[in-house]
Every structure is written in structure tokens, then in C-alpha cells.
Amino acid sequence: SGKDGTIRHVFSCVNPQGCNVKSFKSPTEEENLHDFLWRIYAHLPEKRMIQIFNRSHYEDILFPAVHGLIDKKEIQERHEVINKFEEHLQNNNTIILKFYLHISKKEQHKRLEARLTNPEKKWKYNADDKKESKKWSDYMDAYQNVLEGCNKHNPLVIIPADEKWYRN
């Protein structure tokens, strides 16, 4: 969806001393030994700092839901925990802005193909990307569920991201 490029573009004029970026990948073995928000806590911003999450705690609902690793009850519980977590942060003067960069299925396919064929993009390719792209509909359902369940205190803003000029 262009998360890295969007972060670079949007925050290009921000003093880097006041801004941190954390990219969350699949949970590590150690992270899996704790509750799903444990890995997030260490990266919460200090007062007067900007903390950017490239991916976030929402991934800890999406991937497990799509792969049947958690049931509907646990999905609902995670929604509630996230809503309480975000409310707590806001009550302690943390401003939360949430953005979802949405790309179409066609655009996702195009970008995956570019990673395979364009030498400048091959480094981005992950063999799991192709497999995960086949679960497009399941991911869209999971995203819809998160959008409805985790917007209690502040909405997740959906940004059409097929076109870089619009996304950025």
C-alpha cells in the first residue's frame, strides 16, 4: 500500500529528533510469550514526541483472524482491549491518528508482480506475499471487522492508496 513511502513523504519536514518510526513485523517467539499488546508498549511515545507505527496492534487481530488462529470471541475481546488501550492513551494526553492505506486487489497484484520483475523492487519480495494475496476477501472482511470494532474513541481514516499522488 506504500506505507514506507507515505511515511517518508508526509514526515519529510518534521525534525527527526522529535519523531520515531517503528515497523512491526510478525511477532517474534519472545513476543508470542506475552499478551498481544506487549510488543507495542515499549514503543509508545514520550510526551511531546511523534511515534509512527508502520503496521500496528491491529495486525494482531487481522492475521490470526484470517488464518483461524483466534475465534470470534477472542477477536471481540481484542477489539475491547484495543479500545480501552487507546482510551487510556488519550486520557493521558496521547493524540492518536489512525490511517488505513487501502489498495485495490488489482493494484496489489500489480505491485507484487513488480517485486518479482523489477530488480529495484526484488528486495521487497516475500514468498508469503503471493500466498497471502489469495486471501484478499478474507483480509477485507477482517479489515471491515476491525474498522467497525476498533473505532470507539477515534476513527481509522481510510485513504485510497492506488495512486501515490493521492495517497501522499
Feature-to-residue mapping (PLM):
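Glycine-rich phosphate-binding loop of ATP-dependent small-molecule kinases
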Residues: 1-168
